[in-house]
Amino acid sequence: MEAAPGTAAAAAKPAKSCKKYRMGKRHANIYTYQEPPHSNSDEDISEEKADSQDPEQVFQNIQYQKEVMSNIRCRPWPMRQKLRVLRQAKEIVLKYEGRLTRTRGYQAAGAELWRKFLRLAYNFVVLFIPWEMRIKKIESHFGSGVASYFIFLRWLFGINIVLTIMTGAFVVLPELLAGAPFGSTVSKTIRQEDLKTAQDLDTIWSLGGYLQYSVLFYGYYGSDRKIGKAGYRLPLAYFLVGMAVFAYSFIILLKKMAKNSRMSLASASDENYTFCWRLFCAWDYLIGNPEAAESKAAAIVNSIREAILEEQEKKKSKNLAVTISLRIIANILVLLSLTGSIYIIYFVVDRSQKLENNKRELTLWEKNEVSVVVSLITMIAPSAFELVAALEMYHPRTTLRFQLARVLVLYLGNLYSLIIALLDKVNSMSVTNSIYSIYQVSNNSTPSSATGTPAKEDTLSATISDAQMNSSESHAQSLPTAGSLVNNTASSNSAQNQCWETYVGQEMLKLSIIDMIFTVASILLIDFFRGLCVRYLSDCWCWDLESKFPEYGEFKIAENVLHLVYNQGMIWMGAFFSPCLPAFNVLKLIGLMYLRSWAVLTCNVPHQQVFRASRSNNFYLAMLLFMLFLCMLPTIFAIARYKPSLSCGPFSGQEKIYDIVSETIQNDFPAWFNSVIAYISSPVVVLPALLLLFMLIYYLQSIARSLKFTNNQLRMKIQAERTEDKKKVVQMAVGQNLVDIPDDQIMSDFTQNSEGTRFQSLDGSDKRPDKDGGLISQESSVRASTPRKNGSVLNFESPVSKGTRIQTISQTVPHAVPSTDVARPVNTTPTTSASLTPAPSVSSAQKPRNDHTTNRYPSVVHGSASELCKTKPYTPVTFKKRIGDVHSEPLFRKSIRQVNPDAFGAGAPVFVGRRPHATRYFIVNENEPRKKSARSTSRLQRQFRIEEPEDIVELYPCNVRRYVVQTPQCMYSPHPSEDEEDEEALGRHYVKRSHRPRSLSDLRPAPRFYIGDRADGHVLTSKVHYKSWDDGFELDLDRPPYAYKKVHLKNVEADQHYLEPQVKPKTKHMLEQSLTESDSVSIESSSDPQNSSNDQYIQVIHSKEKYLKPGTKLTKKKSNTNIELNMSEPNELVCSNV
């Protein structure tokens, strides 16, 4: 049976590195070409060999490729493979030979240095990421949910840094450097009455005095269109920077959300192999710090806890009616809380305005009651929401999102109620400014001491001080109105106090300061002092304070995240009226980072329900985007609705704040540009542009929906495939396929047609394996690891196809099988006869055919087809231990030279080169002489395969050239078992005796492993080193022959243990006789000698190489070069079931 010529390159072999290739070149005269296990082409190896940038390695690779090109004719490869390797070698030489020049070498060295510099620079920049190690430490102990808060805080810190640079560089610094100095104008001068209390704590706390007339607020900036020698347009810059703050915030938020969305779509789902990935792939082997290792271990434990909670939440059963009722009650309570908080804030703001109108001097509480009440509601309400959320019984992540949404609504309600009350105050101040402007006009037309007579119609009586005379007397002006009479009494110098933009900025900054104070107080009271009480009073208290009330504090993710959103909303809302508010927020966030991180690591404990946070944190960003939009609306409304103050600010004298843009275009730009801007801002252009934008948004949204749908379909497909793989693995693990197969079907599969390149599946259909990938695909499953009762077939398969496989399957045959059924002695001359074809089923029996088929090698028949077909069903083999721990030594491959065949007799192992590629089964009857060449049956089905043999060494008769075996160092167990001690004792007994090889007929049968590439070859079951006699091999006489290799089967224990027999030297003319007497000069049955005739084997041989030419005799096989041995991987040892 001859294999196809291309099958030699089909099976994948173990990959070798470039270094191993070069070592093989030095120690061998012919270079072997092997492919990596997962590659079917030679390009990967060539690129791997030639990709090195080292000139020395490039030179060695080029020399190697040139040697390959020169010796390509001598290699036993198919022509297609030779042409492919030759073409690739030429390409590599042409591509990399130019690198050996001096210029190319300098360029390569410079490029390598530049890459190293960039890598070092990147590592250096990473060191400057703020608070990275602190956040990693928190994440390792408290999980990704708590760490997401600090990551979000750091990101907000970066945004505020940019906002501070924008306002500072374009607004604050130009005003300080080129604007009017302090005290030069009315808006920058403190009244004489206020100088006495300007430095009092009460005044500073209310942001009055010197703070009011500083760059912190809007009123300090001058209204000059151009300042300094360069003519810097400060009013225009103030307006554009105010708008740029909102634009930049929108852009950076949307960009971050888009990036996170792409990352979440590109990332794999964590629902598959959750615990395996965390258990086996989570450790970072680059950790060299004990503290970092401890943090990483804590992080792995936390991630496993998160995964366990995820699985528990999926399986939790719920009562639908009770759950819906509780959720309705919880939402009603939340709505009542929100309504009450909004009413309280509006009530406090209205009361504060009345007190300001009625009382001349306000107390400290009356000045700050609005900010204090807002901060108290902000601190208390989230805890109430958390108690309500416990009724809903949502998943922890869903609970967090509901909690975030409710707290967000609370904060927005607080801010909007505050801003509405402030806008009412702004409206009244705008009315006062209008009255003051009317008074100025009328005062210019009449003497200052004149008193107007009120008319009979409704009049507006206003008492306004004369700012020009700086006196305390009041002048009554009668102004006709269509409404009611309003009396507004203003103190002296009221024009300076009626700057509503400064008032809004003061309220926002005051609210931020008080919020920071309450945050620090809550951390100290709720976390620190609470932790101290629990820690030191738990021993002397009536109950356990750690497990019951008050317990240690837990880090509330929803409350703290929304607090950051609320704080940033205040900054956006007041940034236009207080340019230094982002700078203050930077300092606040720095303090909050250190204080919160210290409190978490010192005072808090991890949440009882640790859960995984969202990987992208897009929910946080979506809330922040929503807050940005809602906080931008009041500012835009105030800019568009109210007239700017007349006596303060850069827009004084303008009808609207945004008029500064049109004024600048009219005065500072040419006329054609003004006309273009007017045309672009007309409805003729604006409306079509808006329609086009809407259509574009709809189109992009449609594409996004379709891509999202496709992504979900692909994700479901991947998940389905993984589920199928899991099912297959489970079925293979329990041996479901093998258990369900009846015995007669197994026998019919063992007796298929003997075509080497075809195999028949269980459904009867013939299938030809693929030339390249068939072997790998056929070997890719893992079978049952325990013996089955319907046949002693142990199936262990490696996922990678190996070059040579031998599998032995044992079964019990009846005692009445006559010895005449066994084949006759070997006839070394091929004859023309039909091959041994076993019957296709158990019921069909035929006579054994002892003749040879032409073009077939002489081999030994281990049994006949009739014996196989007449056997009883499989009987289980009793193992005392599993076949799991089979120790073997590393695989060493050396060149082998020819030695004298009679140097050590026939017992010495004989090795030949690679054998033909085919799958062959040999029926082995243990105590019967092997006389006839076996005929190959077809390849076994995948469910009947056994683990690949551990080591494969081929032994051949004396008429073939033989090579000497060098003994490796054996691996002994530090605690030998009783059987091993008996073997060692018997070994010491052998040392005292002569080391002359004995006849096999004098030895007791021993358990053997049938591993080999040919049926007529002798088999060694040990890992061996090969060394030629000329290289200095010396026989170790201190060890008995049986101890040259000791196979440690820790989990395999046969019914009886025997020593391996010594092999007696034979001459060439005694070959046939030795084969008859000693069962092919190798091994007898491994069971009891009395029942050894009942043991029958099917020896399965997979060989990768091509057949030799027809008619070639092994006795005339010459080897002019060193022969490469067919060795298997170290994980291919198979124990035969006896």
From Swiss-Prot:
It is a multi-pass membrane protein. Residues 764-773 have a biased composition (Basic and acidic residues). It is found in: Membrane. One of its GO terms (cellular component) is plasma membrane. Expressed in a range of tissues including cerebrum, cerebellum, retina, cochlea, lung, liver and heart. Also expressed in the apical, medial and basal portions of the basillar papilla. One of its GO terms (molecular function) is mechanosensitive monoatomic ion channel activity. Glycans are attached at N272. Residues 1-20, 29-54, 753-859, 973-1005, 1065-1095 are annotated as: Disordered. Residues 1-155, 224-233, 349-369, 423-508, 591-618, 698-1138 are cytoplasmic. Coiled coil: none annotated. Residues 177-202, 255-327, 391-401, 530-569, 640-676 are extracellular. Residues 989-998 have a biased composition (Basic residues). Probable component of an ion channel. Belongs to the TMC family. This is Transmembrane channel-like protein 3. The lineage of its organism: Eukaryota, Metazoa, Chordata, Craniata, Vertebrata.
